Amino acid sequence: GGGVAGTSCAYHLAKYGWKNVVLLERDQLTSGTTWHAAGLIGQLGATSTITKLRKYSLDLYKELEKTTGLSTGLKQNGAITVASSKDRMQELLRQATTAQLSNVEVEVLNKARIKELYSVLKNDDLVGGVYMPKDGQADPVGVTNVLAKAAKMLGVQIFEKSPVKKILVKNKRICGVETSQGKIDCEYVVLATGMWSRQIG
């Protein structure tokens, strides 16, 4: 699939030494669900692994803009997450501590600071919140195009208008894929086809 997931997989496989990586897209890059995504980039996660992955993604987008000369449309305008209960605030504090351990910039907020940062927000029933100044948004199409170009720079071949008709199996192992353009022999397949996955048998 030629969305953000597929291009990211292709880029990272090539980056970490995999050879002969091929990305097949049924239509054009970003023509699936990626095109509809909001592109929000928040670093605060429920676990340290998710937080690290989100920070990595943000840093990667900035790095690949320089590498490829293309824009992801990244705007780091910050994000506030608020809590209206003590339990929710405790969860935000836990996540904020985890984020700080991963070198993510985060500020714990009281009601007054929330009002200062976002004056139109009614804060009467709030306990507090957290502010992530480096969070923001990017253009999902831009991110995909940046990842695709970076992948190509590492030797990945990308074929658009090449829908996969079926995954070929021999002796209970994947041995290739059949596309509209012909057969490709391979040992491994990464399915990044979103809601079209069921069509591949």
Language model features with spans:
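Glycine-rich Rossmann-fold phosphate-binding loop(s) that bind the pyrophosphate
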Residues: 1-3, 26, 193
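Short loop/edge segments at beta-strand edges and connector loops
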Residues: 25, 110, 160-162
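N-terminal Rossmann-fold NAD(P) dinucleotide-binding loop
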Residues: 6-7
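Helical element adjacent to the flavin cofactor pocket in flavoenzyme catalytic cores
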Residues: 130-188, 192-199
